């Protein structure tokens, strides 16, 4: 895919890692590809990229942790950085918790959260308050012995058909 032809100036790649780091890089930074590839994000040891989205720099971002919390902030709270930068803290995570999902909310949509024990919850985006980046967030779904940890968060519309299944087991 040739990024230079597909996206105009003013677009960004917004990335989030499991350790709560976020990064916004101008899309033009990826227009000159090399045969050995390009580094998009410098990761700490043990950290992984959980999500990336192409944005216009004026959107909102929602980050969900496996502890059941969510934080919502303006994308403009994160400055644009070069390709090799590490990024900034998007969400403060307690010891042992990880980020599981990043969403760029659309107006009128809802968030469907699912727990490890099969519980689900559908919540309007307007129910999540907007804060500055770097906080611990608010409870999206209670994470306890009954529910288990949060395992997924996706954006859905009123007419969305949802199918959830457990992973297949090898025989």
Q: What residues fall within each predicted segment?
A:
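Core mixed alpha/beta domains of very large multi-subunit molecular machines
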Residues: 4-43, 67, 79, 86, ...
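Extracellular glycan-binding segments that recognize GlcNAc-based cell-wall polysaccharides
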Residues: 4-9, 36-62, 84-112, 136-161
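Contiguous effector/interaction surfaces
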Residues: 75-78, 94-130
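Alpha-helix initiation/capping motif
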Residues: 17, 26, 56, 65, ...
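Short loop/beta submotifs within extracellular cysteine-rich repeat domains
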Residues: 21-25, 31-35, 60, 69-73, ...
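Single conserved hydrophobic/aromatic residue that forms the stacking wall/gate
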Residues: 1-3, 162-171
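Short beta-strand motif characteristic of blades in beta-propeller domains
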Residues: 13-17, 61-66, 110-116, 161, ...
